[in-house]
Structure formats: C-alpha cells, structure tokens
Amino acid sequence: MTNIRKTHPLMKIVNNTFIDLPTPSNISSWWNFGSLLGICLILQILTGLFLAMHYTSDTMTAFSSVTHICRDVNYGWIIRYMHANGASMFFICLFMHIGRGLYYGSYTFLETWNIGVILLLATMATAFMGYVLPWGQMSFWGATVITNLLSAIPYIGTNLVEWIWGGFSVDKATLTRFFAFHFILPFIITALAMVHLLFLHETGSNNPTGIPSDTDKIPFHPYYTIKDILGAMLLILVLMLLVLFTPDLLGDPDNYIPANPLNTPPHIKPEWYFLFAYAILRSIPNKLGGVLALVLSILILVLVPFLHTSKQRSMMFRPISQCMFWILVADLLTLTWIGGQPVEHPYIIIGQLASIMYFLIILVMMPAASTIENNLLKW
C-alpha cells in the first residue's frame, strides 16, 4: 500500500515541500533564514490576532487600549512586546536572507527573487502601519512625515495624500484604515510567501558554491528539519531575551507620550530597520529627489540580476566581489547609524557620502569587480 503522505492531495503538497524535497547536501546556516521568516510571520499573525482582540482603532482610545493590554490583560504585556520585538527579529532575518541571496547569486532565480522584493515591500508597509497604531508621538509624526512624502508626486501629490489620510490631516480615518490594512497585509504576505516557495521549488535551492547540485541531493527531512529547529530555537531565545530583559531597547521613548498634533518631537525617526532608507531620503535636499532615492534604494534589488557580469554564480570563489559585498554591508550599517542622528554637521555629509556609495557599489563597483575577476581567470 502506498504511503498516504505521497497520495493524499493535501499531504502530497506538504510532503513535496517539507519532507521528500530534494535539497543540496552542502547548504549552510545562511539557508536557515527562509524557515525563520516563516516562523516570524506565524508568530506575528498569532500575537497580532490576540492584540487586535483588545485594541481599539480610535484616536481617543488607541493609546489607552495599548496601555490597557499591557496592564490589565492576562499576559498582555508579553504578547505586545513579542509582537513589537518580533517585528525586529523579522527584519533581521529578512536582511540576512536578502544578503545571502546577493552573496551566493540566488537572485538568478528571477521569479523567486522578484516575488521576494514584493514581499520585502509588503512587509515594510505592514511594519510602518503597525508603528502608527499605538498612537504615540512617534506614531503620529512618523505617519505624518512619511505619508506627506507622496505630496512630492507632481500634479496629483496633494490629492493623493489627502485621499490616504481620509481628511486634511492624520486623524481618526487614517488610524482606522491603517489598522484595517495592517490586519489584512500579513495574510497577503503569507499567500505571496507560498508563491515564493512555489517558484523556488520549480528550480530547487541554490547552494554556497553556485554550482548545480542535481548529482548530490538529500531529503529535506530529517537533515534540514532538525537544522531548522535549531535555528528556530536560537531565534526564539534571542527574541525572548529581548522581550523579557530589554523590551524597549529597540523602541522610541517618544512613543510613550500620547500623540499631540500641536507638539513636534525634536527628532522624528522611524524604527531602526527603516533608518538606512530614511538616511538616503534625508541625504537629498530636494523633496522629490529624496522620495525617488528612497524608492530606488529598495527597487534597486530588482536590477541586481541584470547587473550580474560574472561567469560564476556565487561569490564563494570571488575575493574582489566579496570585498565589495562587505563594503556594502558596512555602508548599510553606516546609513542605519546616520538615520538615527540629527540633521547637522558632520552627519549630513557622512549620510550623503554613504548614500552615493550605496548606489555606486551596486550599480558600478560590483559589476566592475566581476568583470575584473573574469579577466583574471582568463574567461
């Protein structure tokens, strides 16, 4: 009798995705982040669901409802902080996952890569709207500043902003719709993640060497299920250390002050995972130019597969490209630091130089390094 795992229509899908999936035998821990992102997503949906049971999306009661969750709801504080810090863990895993894709040339799977970029944009939108919901000072002013950027779009900008606000300023209508979108988007992300996996399993996984591994495949279970469980345990360990010891480490103290449209905080800044993009936005003195740079800083990922000039897929055997990659990582860390600093000398010039470097490395230096390596190998 054939195993039900291989015959049942639903079980067959699960089997071909998580059990009998042929997997390269040499993939490293950098390939763990896909499953960790899945765990983060499930965790965020579950904690978010329980928070939504007690949250009210009204400007008069939103701040109080979050306080009520932390003070009066059974284990409300842990659910709230798991959700807030879970977002940080989500983005850490996302950045690692994208970095892995860039380093090992996984972006040559075009469909998988492009769905991944859409997933990144959807996750960023979800996180931004979630940050608005507690209705603290940084929530209100963050929403005001970021939505206002759309007014830089010629001709339709102002109308577009007022349409998104649902009025002439960030108010009750804005908060209500942000809550609605924040609730629905994770389910859209889940559907997109399934499409992401579908496209990945059409080609099979890449591996650190970038060389096709069809001759050397092993079943996903038990080899990589056990490896993923170890990764998940480490993820939950780090998350719970954050939640239980320093829950507000990555937050902004200004968000414990209720939103006040008459009082602007001294330094408006987003959550840490948006600071690199915020620094690029601020580095251009022109409003429309800044908005374009901000959008391009993310959409540049779509161009990466077309900028691949190397005869090799992975950077494993390409030392010059490796140097470029790690300079890019250092540059992104610099941008993240600058994004959290006030707009004054010397931070302005550092931010501008780091922004120029970011685009220069991806568009010019990396393809050039690949061409040099090809010539050195006489290819």
UniProtKB/Swiss-Prot annotation:
It is found in: Mitochondrion inner membrane. It is a multi-pass membrane protein. GO terms for cellular component: mitochondrial inner membrane; respiratory chain complex III. GO terms for molecular function: metal ion binding; ubiquinol-cytochrome-c reductase activity. Binds 2 heme b groups non-covalently. Heme 1 (or BL or b562) is low-potential and absorbs at about 562 nm, and heme 2 (or BH or b566) is high-potential and absorbs at about 566 nm. This is Cytochrome b. It comes from Capra hircus aegagrus (Wild goat). The gene is MT-CYB.
